[in-house]
Regions:
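ABC ATPase "signature
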Residues: 212-213, 464-465
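Catalytic Walker B motif of ABC-type/P-loop ATPase nucleotide-binding domains
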Residues: 154-157, 406-410
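Conserved ABC transporter NBD signature motif
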Residues: 58-66, 74, 308-316, 323-324
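Conserved ABC ATPase signature
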Residues: 129-133, 340, 381-388
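Conserved ABC ATPase "signature" region
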Residues: 98, 102, 107-125, 348, ...
Length: 493
């Protein structure tokens, strides 16, 4: 008997065909990957297999039980870890585990041995609220919650999105140990190194299975999607070196000197100093909990430093918050768009927030819709857009007012490789106009696209330089190895 068997599964949301005639099977004890571009139907497929959605047509079996007719038989047998972690932020670590155990008719005490190896890494923090955990710790807690009732099949919908490379490696070490215990694992991932850890992979696109095979065969066959050509930079067109921009590429638009942010005795940001030039793409890297987000909040005027100095676009970060906000753009991990407004309404709203006026807003809105090829979508709710399209819109809105600096906080999390490359072309275009890019990312291939990089560990900047300089200094072949080498020395969790 197969662990999973699908026969001609289809699912539509009104006119949108999320899944069309999907058929495949998964062997027991297999790590089976589901990959594909944004909007391919991956999450819909997971929800059907975990009995959260009913298919419109076809049959799906989990451990031999029908997902429609035998839901109650299936639910105790499956664990599900959605992409955004289904944790209750105001409950403690231990309270979350007890809650999920109760949902599945068991107790935390009974399930403890099945999660002991994973849970032991966060058990010292069992009384801490889930919302106060780092990304890596949330990931371990979410996995523990999905396993506390001892399921035989585990579904993971992009579980490592927004998590640093070290935590991703740790998760996959855990998954390999689960497979050794006979647990079947079905995982969706946008990371190519994770795809290669699967036994087999299904490529899903436009709601259809386009191919199923070993990872390397699938990646080669669909290389245009998963291995698009590397971005070739024309560095002469950036940092104001050409195009008649007359920009001073040596002018520092961000300057930080001995910056500290303490919460009681805990120093989230611990004496950091650096500068960023006009038109530079500066990668601000660090493991989860290293202090990146806190530092970014200081630079954008969202928080006050405990000590030290800093300026952004010529304004003091301690005393001139409002001036800074007028000269920067900001794009968060969640894109900061309003899902219940249309594309056009979102653009106009943010234009107004940035102080733009009537005719200018109308002209630039039309210009942006045309550039993004969103003219036919201008009256569509943002909630209806695929993730990659939301990403492009959010970035375009964040630089709509031509700020001197734009802060991008993990802007490509959960987006497929081809869409990420397209997004970076937008970044290069903005940098060519003299906009300074300050970006955090957990994708180390993106780190290679930056002019310079800093790597934070335990609140301090441990390394800073160009990708080539850092690889040479630490004698490593790529930025993934450099990052892992430095981040593994962290003492914070």
């Amino acid at each position: 008997m197969k662990a999973i068997e699908l026969r001609h599964i289809s699912k539509a949301y009104g006119p949108i065909k999320a899944l069309q005639d999907v058929s495949f099977s998964v062997d027991k004890g297999e790590i089976f990957g589901i990959i594909g571009p944004d909007g391919a139907g991956k999450t819909t497929l997971f929800r059907i297999l975990t009995t959260l959605l009913v298919p419109d047509a076809g049959t799906a079996l989990v451990e031999g039980f029908d997902v429609v007719k035998q839901m109650r038989k299936i639910r105790p047998r499956v664990g599900y870890m959605p992409g955004r972690f289904s944790l209750y932020q105001d409950l403690t670590v231990e309270e979350n585990l007890k809650f999920f155990a109760t949902l599945f008719g068991t107790t935390f005490a009974k399930g403890y041995n099945s999660i002991k190896t994973i849970y032991s890494q966060i058990e010292p923090f069992r009384h801490r609220r889930a919302g106060a955990l780092s990304g890596g710790m949330k990931q371990k807690l979410a996995l523990s919650c999905a396993l506390v009732h001892e399921p035989s099949v585990l579904f993971l919908d992009e579980p490592t999105t927004g998590v640093d490379p070290v935590s991703r490696k740790e998760l996959w070490e855990m998954l390999l140990s689960l497979r050794a215990r006979g647990i079947t694992i079905i995982a969706a991932t946008p990371y190519l190194d994770e795809v290669r850890k699967c036994d087999r992979v299904a490529f899903l696109s436009d709601g259809q299975v386009k191919g199923i095979d070993e990872p390397e065969i699938i990646l080669q066959h669909f290389k245009d999607v998963f291995n698009p050509p590397p971005i070739v930079q024309d560095t002469s067109s950036r940092t104001g070196a050409s195009q008649g921009n007359n920009l001073d590429k040596d002018e520092n638009v961000i300057t930080v000197s001995h910056l500290v942010k303490a919460f009681g005795k805990f120093r989230a940001v611990d004496d950091i100093s650096f500068s960023v030039r006009r038109g530079e793409i500066f990668g601000f890297l660090g493991a989860n909990g290293a202090g990146k987000t806190t530092a970014m909040h200081l630079l954008t005027g969202l928080n006050q430093p405990t000590s030290g100095k800093g300026s952004v676009a010529g304004f003091d970060i301690s005393t001139q918050h409002e001036q800074i906000k007028k000269h920067i753009g900001y794009m968060s991990q969640k894109f900061a768009l309003y899902d219940d407004l249309t594309v056009s309404e979102n653009i106009r709203l943010f234009a107004g927030i940035y102080g733009m006026k009537g005719k200018e807003i109308t002209h630039k809105t039309d210009e942006l819709l045309s550039k993004l090829q969103f003219i036919d979508l201008k009256d569509s709710l943002v909630a209806s857009l695929p993730l990659g399209w939301k990403q492009k819109l959010a970035f375009s809105v964040s630089i709509f007012h031509e700020p001197e600096v734009v802060f991008l906080d993990e802007p490509t999390g959960g987006v497929d490789p081809a869409t990420r490359r397209q997004f970076w072309l937008l970044i290069y275009e903005a940098a060519a106009r003299g906009i300074t890019i300050f970006v955090t990312t957990h994708y180390m291939d993106e780190a290679e696209y930056c002019d310079r990089i800093s790597i934070m560990v335990d609140g301090k900047i441990k390394a800073i330089g160009s990708p080539e300089e850092l690889k040479h200094t630490y004698n490593q072949p790529d930025m993934d190895y450099v990052f892992t080498l430095l981040a593994r020395a962290a003492t914070r969790t």
